[in-house]
Amino acid sequence: MTELTADQDVVRRYLCDHAPGSRVVSARLTQTARALVTHQNMPPQVAALCQEMSLAASLLTNCLKFEGEMIVQAKSDGPVSLLVAECTSDGQLRTTAQWDPALSATGFRDLVGTGYFAVTVDPTQGERYQGIVTLDADSIAACMNQYFHQSEQLDTEMWLAADGHSAGGLLVQRLATE
């Protein structure tokens, strides 16, 4: 077994013995979370949003069995007008944002304003799929949950947290039964 250090990014998948028909994916992004802050010179509130978007893309990518790319995007009229996280099936992750340099807002709703939230699955082979929901929830996790409830066939919930130094998330999904 490999020993994990606090600086590593870790994504794990689980099937639950005590909850048959459920799948859990957990993620901790420490190295990636710090790189976003260090290399992109973002304000802390934008970095936290990017870290959560990175988590969402990582969790989704590791929940599906496919080869290709998962893209999670928020486009809005707020001071943070664009958030995009792309995660490939081989674990490559890229996240970017566009924000107003005079940014002073701190709450999610004040940062993003109104717009749309999109999840795109772009498989290497097969058809591209995109689901879009309005950007009217109170967090990235809530936007993801709104997407799951409107666009997906499986009951799924996601929780995300980021503090600028590390980020963690959990996705719980009820699998289809026959």
Q: What does each model-identified segment do?
A:
Residues 2-178:
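Interaction interfaces in information-processing and related assembly proteins
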